[in-house]
Amino acid sequence: MSLVLAVYGKGGIGKSTTSANISAALALKGAKVLQIGCDPKHDSTFPITGKLQKTVIEALEEVDFHHEELSPEDIVETGFAGIDGLEAGGPPAGSGCGGYVVGESVTLLQEMGLYDKYDVILFDVLGDVVCGGFSAPLNYADYAVIIATNDFDSIFAANRLCMAIQQKSVRYKVQLAGIVANRVDYTKGGGTNMLDQFAEQVGTRLLAKVPYHELIRKSRFAGKTLFAMDENEPELADCLAPYNEIAEQILSKTPIASVPKPIGDREIFDIVGGWQ
């Protein structure tokens, strides 16, 4: 039985980079990992495979949407450290529903029996959209992980995601493993002061603190995980540490997790406004 993670967060927050590095850390610790990109721009697995791979929707179009004609090799690419990558893809811009494609991808994975092949399946899910198909990974996830930065918009999105996780937990097993503080900079922006208070307020914790560092950005543009970068890069160890920390907690199979207690949409403006 695979351990299933669903990674969410505000658009542009660094989910795909974070997801790829978590997958790499897990794989290098011996886990067989499948990362599933759930975004129409289909670049989640780029740091793992080094290319924009064929999407599930493209593969389905080639067989006129006959699921039974596809095999895992048609939709799965193997990349860094033996990690398998899959991209759900999406309809053309301005038409169709991207969430539907995510739901179709989940169905296809179940039909192919891929859940039994992996130690960890990681869903990297589009932004803070938690309606319809984009919330589907929460139906299958053991744990949700929220990526956030130390600002109001990110915290507001994280709170909305907590609402979705709380709602899904009524019918499904999903719990919130915690929040990954991304692009942490103690020289400006308060470090993690706002995120620390938010995590306490909703009953969760910070899983790790990823520093704001040019090397992380550099690795993304190079189409690599941090773990594939030159080991002589300055401060590489500091950048790798939080991802290894997350992987160790996940592989312990008993990460501290809970059902979050989100703040009301209107209430959060008053509460966050009073934080220092």
From Swiss-Prot:
Binding site for Mg(2+): 16
Name of the protein in question: Light-independent protochlorophyllide reductase iron-sulfur ATP-binding protein
Cofactor: [4Fe-4S] cluster
Binding site for [4Fe-4S] cluster: 97, 131
Catalyzed reactions per annotation: chlorophyllide a + oxidized 2[4Fe-4S]-[ferredoxin] + 2 ADP + 2 phosphate = protochlorophyllide a + reduced 2[4Fe-4S]-[ferredoxin] + 2 ATP + 2 H2O
Quaternary structure (record): Homodimer. Protochlorophyllide reductase is composed of three subunits; BchL, BchN and BchB.
Positions bound to ATP: 12-17, 41, 182-183
The UniProt record lists the keyword Metal-binding: yes
